[in-house]
Amino acid sequence: YDFSRIAEKHTTSGAIYFVIYKKHGTVVADTPFFSQVSEGISQGCKKNDYRLKISYIYEDEDTITKQIEEIQYSDCAGIILLGTEMEAGDLKPFLNLPIPVVLLDAYFETVPCNCVLINNVQGAYLAARHLIRSCKTQPGYLRSAYQISNFAERSSGFYKAIRASGMSSSRSIVHSLTPSMEGAYADMLEVIKNGEELASCYFADNDLIAVGAIKALKDSGYRIPQDIGIVGFDNLPLGSVIEPALTTIHVPKQYMGEAAAQKLIDLLNTPGQPPTKTEVSTMLVKRGTV
């Protein structure tokens, strides 16, 4: 038996680093979303006999360069970079590295790089269209008070559906809420307490905002969905256990992670490819909040 074949299979040099970039940590928290993405990356690495190491980078000018250098002079063969909280300028030091980098969960028009992300525009469009068809009225928007590229794209998909239905973008009622359950709950209570005008249905930038807002509305005597309908985004496990269960946009999270790992391994095997952008489509999950 030719044992050299076994040896060959395991000679992948170095590890793949999943680098989680934390700017303010309000969006990249330890939610099931990110654990499922990590699971996908882990599966993708296993399939190709690469070891996976996870590294956190916290935004702080002085230490970023040092942190990136540490990765560069380690056993790192390539990086999957979680760009959820990043801005275009934050990418530069990573792209100067002599190893391949795949950006996950973000995309910037100004930076040519390989990236894998959610089709946010399509997801938000589906959500808004569902609200318009079901509620026969103009949906409001529960937007994140912290802006990241994902939310900007969701905003664009939401307004695209509004315009496609012949409605005016400027007429949608918008509330800015903290993108966490507790934060959105407190902010929405404030909106209600201040007597601000409420829409009869809303699209929320993510499930955490949706669930926090639903709790605030219910605690203030509103019935969901009879008085106010809501659609979230992410399809977190939490959405199926609240009452009523949350209508939301499903994102194939594990697949995103696997696709990013596969892309990085392709770049390691065949360097010099032109950068590509991979968008993973979403799906409307109809439950009880509309």
Regions found by a protein language model. Give the residues of each.
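Residue-level detector of anion-binding/catalytic polar loops
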Residues: R51, P100, T137, S168, ...
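Alpha-helical recognition/docking segments in bacterial nutrient-uptake
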Residues: T11-R129, I192-E197, L208
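Flexible loop/turn connectors
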Residues: Y185-V290
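Periplasmic-binding protein-like
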Residues: C76-L82, G140-R143, V174, E196-N206, ...
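Hinge/beta->alpha junction and helix N-cap segments in small-molecule ligand-binding domains
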Residues: K23-Q36, I54-T63, V116-L126, L142-R163, ...
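N-terminal helix-turn-helix DNA-binding module of bacterial transcription factors
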Residues: Y1-T12, V290
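Nucleotide donor/acceptor-binding cores
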Residues: T12-I16, A128-I132, K136-P139, S200, ...
